[in-house]
């Protein structure tokens, strides 16, 4: 940069002002290129609001499911070290207080959910037991030194009531103190004596009752810790237990037997272990499905194939509730992104209000829906013309159809729960043991056309009186909570059935018992008379078979349930406008959640436009776009090579492709500088391909690399 001054000196040249990058609002991503939708912002806001409601409901469910487990843990921790400050000369008392209290927390193999559980557990312990709660992972503790360093650093960070000067001294001692239990014990005694009179706040409400609050150490992944670290720490801690009240919580993913496999008897005898078991993952899944999908509270629903994908990933991959909820969130996002009419996927009063403001283009979208077309075809000719030409009449009819869809879902889930109560206890579970299995079957087809449903009805016709009454009482509670007019009489009908069962007199019971008992006349006879009597009895039963009062009433109950199923458990595809609330793009969801890594990697490198929606990246098959990412260019070039790739030839080909785009951008840089930049870009692209496993160095030739993959992917 030049200056017109003739004197010598230093001149300051301010850099050019760089424009601040304007961040694109998230709702703008709902616009598909040129086809900009006028309600994209409203759809995004609706999605965000619904997801926040579903997220809050999920968190509340997790708290309720973990409440019993946390309460048991807190009770165990509060009972531990109760006599910490009691000086007793009793030998048994001294031996007992040399044992470290251990809570073996078996959480299952859903490791991805453990962090959330431990986070909630830490908060619960700090609110109810002690402020000194430390969590350690095996990856942060390769040896005893790092183990104690992490323990001391986190423990000293728990001292929240210290003054600024005390905090500085704590940080200094944290750096200078030798990592051992002696200074840690003395620090604990000093801190508890200082902070005990001043303890206040939510986190110390319960711990203030303790003369010396315990230190809780959570080992999140106990199986991953080395045996030597665990043994040394337990032995050392047991010697300082009289001055450093330690409680251990072992996070176990497999089985409690792992404790005895990792620790010898001499070490495990220093522990006072109590086992705690979390709820099975399948119960968590059933509860989440029950509160998020099997309810009319949230209008968003998913199809049978989408639900099958989410449950299969859960059951056959990770057992993770968090991943299941993320898959549900992705389904919700894809639905609001791909379906323009998802703007009506909200509460019924709000949906009716939004229908009044629909544009002409949105009305055409309603007319294009396959379910609405089938509905129009069933109407009379005059109504068909009005629906296809009159927007006002269309909006009124849409409001009515959405209201019918809401009533359909309310009745659907009530009858579904009733049917599940009847079939969940049948032998061999013909319709599934879990309600999600029954729900998938009902979403897929007419359930009454299946063989499993027919076999379930046969088994229901053989239920005993007590079992049938128990099931009817459960169904009565389900329908009693309903306020719908159509199902209001159902609860009364079930109540009548229960009254009739209770009014069965003793004669009916005796008649039922007599029908299954053998006559008393066949006590002693020969073979001929026995055969003759059996034939007569068989003929008598065939000609004069009469049902008891109980059998007649049981048949009425089964027929009544069958009528409910045929009337209310219709597949969602039969309902007009079901596309507004149902997400059915199972293929899209499978690509995102259960994609094959190798195929996805090949697609990204071979066709970057597939993931980066940039029109400049479009190219014909076999061609290399000039402005593609460097790794894509290097990958396409390496596909044309044989088993050994010459790095020089590969670099020259890479430079040839890249310079075709560079020359059009700027000509200010010199040729040497451009070559150095291109060479550095090539080295980085080759290193990335090596990291991904496409190539590797070879000792056959120094300037060559070996290709590791063949074929299209």
From Swiss-Prot:
Q: Please give the organism.
A: Spermophilus citellus (European ground squirrel)
Name under which the protein is recorded: Origin recognition complex subunit 3
Annotated compartments = Nucleus
Summarizing the function annotation, the protein's role is: Component of the origin recognition complex (ORC) that binds origins of replication. DNA-binding is ATP-dependent. The specific DNA sequences that define origins of replication have not been identified yet. ORC is required to assemble the pre-replication complex necessary to initiate DNA replication. Binds histone H3 and H4 trimethylation marks H3K9me3, H3K27me3 and H4K20me3.
Q: What is its main location?
A: nucleus
Tell me the subunit arrangement: Component of ORC, a complex composed of at least 6 subunits: ORC1, ORC2, ORC3, ORC4, ORC5 and ORC6. ORC is regulated in a cell-cycle dependent manner. It is sequentially assembled at the exit from anaphase of mitosis and disassembled as cells enter S phase.
Task: Read off the InterPro entries from this record.
Answer: ORC3 (IPR020795), ORC3_ins (IPR045663), ORC3_N (IPR045667), ORC_WH_C (IPR040855)
| GO molecular function (one) | DNA replication origin binding
- Gene Ontology biological-process annotations: DNA replication initiation
């Amino acid at each position: 940069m030049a200056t017109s001054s003739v004197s010598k000196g230093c001149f300051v040249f301010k850099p050019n002002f760089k424009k601040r990058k304007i961040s694109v609002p998230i709702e703008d991503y709902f616009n598909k290129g040129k086809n900009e939708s006028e309600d994209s912002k409203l759809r995004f806001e609706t999605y965000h609001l619904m997801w926040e409601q579903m997220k809050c409901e999920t968190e509340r469910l997790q708290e309720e499911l973990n409440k019993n487990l946390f309460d048991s843990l807190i009770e165990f921790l509060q009972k531990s070290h109760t006599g910490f400050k009691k000086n007793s000369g009793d030998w048994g008392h001294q031996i007992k207080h040399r044992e470290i209290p251990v809570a073996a927390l078996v959480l299952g193999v859903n490791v991805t959910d453990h962090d959330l559980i431990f986070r909630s557990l830490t908060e619960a312990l700090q609110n109810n037991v002690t402020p000194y709660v430390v969590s350690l992972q095996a990856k942060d503790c390769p040896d005893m030194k790092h183990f104690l360093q992490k323990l001391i650093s986190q423990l000293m960070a728990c001292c929240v009531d210290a003054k600024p000067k005390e905090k500085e001294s704590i940080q200094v001692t944290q750096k200078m103190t030798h990592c051992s239990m002696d200074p840690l014990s003395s620090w604990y005694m000093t801190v508890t004596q200082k902070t005990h009179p001043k303890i206040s706040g939510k986190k110390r409400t319960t711990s203030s009752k303790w003369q010396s609050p315990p230190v809780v150490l959570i080992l999140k992944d106990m199986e991953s810790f080395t045996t030597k670290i665990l043994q040394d720490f337990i032995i050392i801690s047991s010697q300082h237990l009289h001055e450093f009240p330690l409680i251990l919580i072992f996070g176990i993913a497999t089985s409690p037997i792992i404790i005895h496999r990792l620790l010898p008897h001499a070490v495990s005898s220093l522990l006072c272990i109590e086992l705690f078991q979390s709820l099975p993952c399948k119960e968590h899944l059933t509860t989440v499905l029950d509160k998020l999908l099997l309810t009319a509270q949230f209008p968003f629903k998913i199809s049978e194939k989408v639900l099958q994908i989410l449950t299969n990933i859960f059951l056959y991959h990770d057992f993770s509730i968090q991943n299941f909820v993320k898959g549900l969130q992705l389904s919700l996002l894809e639905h609001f992104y791909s379906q323009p009419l998802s703007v009506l996927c909200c509460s019924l009063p709000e949906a009716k209000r939004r229908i009044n403001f629909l544009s002409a283009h949105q009305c055409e979208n309603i007319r294009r829906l396959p379910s609405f077309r089938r509905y129009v075809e069933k109407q009379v000719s005059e109504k068909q013309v009005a629906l296809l030409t009159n927007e006002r009449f269309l909006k009124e009819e849409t409001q009515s159809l959405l209201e019918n869809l809401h009533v359909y879902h309310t009745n659907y889930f009530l009858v579904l729960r009733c049917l599940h109560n009847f079939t969940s206890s049948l032998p061999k579970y013909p319709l599934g043991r879990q309600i999600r299995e029954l729900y998938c079957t009902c979403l897929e087809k007419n359930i009454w056309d299946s063989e499993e449903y027919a076999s379930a009805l046969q088994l229901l016709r053989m239920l005993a009186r007590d079992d049938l009454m128990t099931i009817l009482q459960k169904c009565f509670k389900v329908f009693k909570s309903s306020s719908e007019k159509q199902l209001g009489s159902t609860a009364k009908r079930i109540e009548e059935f229960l009254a009739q069962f209770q009014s069965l007199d003793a004669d009916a019971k005796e008649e039922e018992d007599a029908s299954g008992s053998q006559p008393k006349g066949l006590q002693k006879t020969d073979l001929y008379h026995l055969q003759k009597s059996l034939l007569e009895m068989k003929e008598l039963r065939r000609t004069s078979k009469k049902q008891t009062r109980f059998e007649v009433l049981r048949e009425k109950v089964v027929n009544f349930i069958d009528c409910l199923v045929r009337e209310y458990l219709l597949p969602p595809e039969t309902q007009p406008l079901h596309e507004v609330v149902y997400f059915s793009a199972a293929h899209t969801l499978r690509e995102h959640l259960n994609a094959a890594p190798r195929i996805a990697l090949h697609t990204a490198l071979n066709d970057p436009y597939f993931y980066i929606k940039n029109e400049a990246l479009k190219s014909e098959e076999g061609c290399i776009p000039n402005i593609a990412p460097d790794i894509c260019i290097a990958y396409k070039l390496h596909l044309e090579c044989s088993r050994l790739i010459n790095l020089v030839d590969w670099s020259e080909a890479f430079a040839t492709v890249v310079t075709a785009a560079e020359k059009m951008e700027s000509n200010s840089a010199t040729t040497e500088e451009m070559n150095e930049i291109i060479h550095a870009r090539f080295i980085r692209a080759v290193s990335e391909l090596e990291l991904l496993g496409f190539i590797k160095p070879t000792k056959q030739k120094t300037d060559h690399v070996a290709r590791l993959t063949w074929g299209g992917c």
